[in-house]
């Protein structure tokens, strides 16, 4: 399972979700249902999950309207599961650092949001999951990449 934590500037609201793995399968309208562990930098998500359990993510060609784009994958240090609070603090810092180099302006100056997928204790211990996936989001939807968007 992967946990999803939105990092949204004050006043924009906060939600949480849990992601579990799913097999890759083709769906209509250009969507590709994919494994939450396998999304790569540059892939776009039709929508960003907001809460509850999700068994797959919908990737889509970035040329089509979408809500999110993977802008970084970072690896957490090995060792015992550090706990949710420590992971969230690390994730927030690492995704914030990567945000500016991707968007072109700092997170606090941006109208865009980010969220992140990170290991749960189960995925950490069972599958040696150490990957954090940082996802930039435009809740209004966007077309094309948000790389260098400077907004």
Predicted regions and their residues:
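Sec-dependent bacterial lipoprotein signal peptides
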Residues: 1-27
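Primary mode marks residue(s) on the alpha4-beta5-alpha5 output face of response regulator receiver
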Residues: 29-151
């Amino acid at each position: 399972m992967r946990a999803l934590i939105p990092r949204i500037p004050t006043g924009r609201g906060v939600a949480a979700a849990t992601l579990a793995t799913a097999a890759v399968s083709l769906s209509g309208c250009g969507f590709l249902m994919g494994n939450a562990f396998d999304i790569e930098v540059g892939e776009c998500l039709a929508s960003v999950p907001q809460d509850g359990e999700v068994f797959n993510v919908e990737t889509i060609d970035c040329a089509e309207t979408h809500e999110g784009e993977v802008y970084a994958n970072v690896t957490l240090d090995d060792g015992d599961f550090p706990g949710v609070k420590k992971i969230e603090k690390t994730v927030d810092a690492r995704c914030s650092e990567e945000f500016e180099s991707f968007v072109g302006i700092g997170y606090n100056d941006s109208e865009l949001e980010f969220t992140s997928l990170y290991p749960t204790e189960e995925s950490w211990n069972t599958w040696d999951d150490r990957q954090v996936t940082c996802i930039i989001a435009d809740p209004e939807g966007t077309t094309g990449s948000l790389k260098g968007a400077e907004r």
